[in-house]
Regions:
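Positively charged n-region of N-terminal signal peptides that target proteins for export
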Residues: 1-5
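Gly/Pro-enriched, hydrophobic low-complexity segments
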Residues: 138-233
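Bacterial N-terminal signal peptides
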Residues: 7-16
Length: 244
């Protein structure tokens, strides 16, 4: 009887380990299906007010590896030339003619609206989160993610993933106590070329900002390698040169 119980427990442990490994591998696959590890990107951010009024921003972004990303504001004219840089958990904002780049935090937002700096300068999910649990939900996988450090913007994520595409359809961003902060909706599949087909639109809303909505529209994503020197404070004023 004892041998039977022991064998059963071993089976459970092995099965649990298999789930964890599968979940971790799936999360890495989701990262690569969303973006190449290093890329250049053009996108538009739209903030929608409760009265329907909108404010739009156009950004050019570059990323290298799992923890380096920078973005340059192209529009509106009032923001043109501003740039942001993220190295791991550290973020900076450069404003032309103001001086040195200033530190910003992940929960602030350089554009206002529901998207915060962590959303705008997003890293690979697998770089910031561990998979606590993996479930099935009809035609979707459901991953329960836990932040690796306290510096990550959201302590927990619930990620619904299309089984056929290994791409997210919805992500709930939660506090440690599982209070909902915001929900991300992934929409409108698009072929970006180079073997990359992914949602071209991410919409977000939040119970903390009732009536507000923010939308991220991806126009171009292209695999491209960059030198490390691009992801430095001294290069922030020169990001426009990457577009030439």
């Amino acid at each position: 009887m004892l041998k039977t119980i022991t064998a059963f427990l071993v089976t459970l442990i092995v099965a649990s380990s298999a789930w964890a490994i599968d979940g971790a591998q799936l999360l890495i696959q989701v990262d690569r299906n969303l973006n190449p590890e290093s890329y250049e990107m053009y996108r538009k951010l739209i903030n929608v007010e409760p009265d329907g009024s909108k404010k739009e921003y156009t950004l050019f972004s570059v990323k290298k590896g799992q923890d380096k990303i920078a973005a340059l504001f192209l529009a509106p004219a009032s923001e043109k030339g501003r740039s942001t840089l993220r190295l791991g958990d550290n973020m900076w904002l450069y404003i032309p003619n103001v001086g040195k780049p200033i530190r910003i935090t992940s929960l602030q937002s350089v554009v206002g609206g529901v998207f915060n700096n962590a959303d705008i300068l997003s890293l690979d999910y697998s770089a910031e989160y561990n998979v606590e649990k993996a479930d099935e939900s009809g035609k979707e996988h459901l991953l329960f993610l836990k932040a690796k450090t306290r510096e990550v913007a959201y302590d927990r994520l619930k990620m619904w993933i299309d089984k056929s595409k290994s791409l997210p359809t919805k992500i709930e961003c939660l506090t440690e106590a599982n209070m909902l902060i915001k929900t991300l909706y992934f929409k409108d599949m698009k072929d970006f070329g180079g073997g990359l087909t992914r949602p071209s639109v991410i919409e977000t809303d939040s119970p903390l900002y009732k009536g507000y909505k923010s939308i991220m529209i991806f126009a171009r994503i292209k695999k491209k390698d960059f030198k490390d020197e691009i992801f430095t404070l001294t290069f922030m004023p020169n990001m426009e040169s990457l577009r030439k």
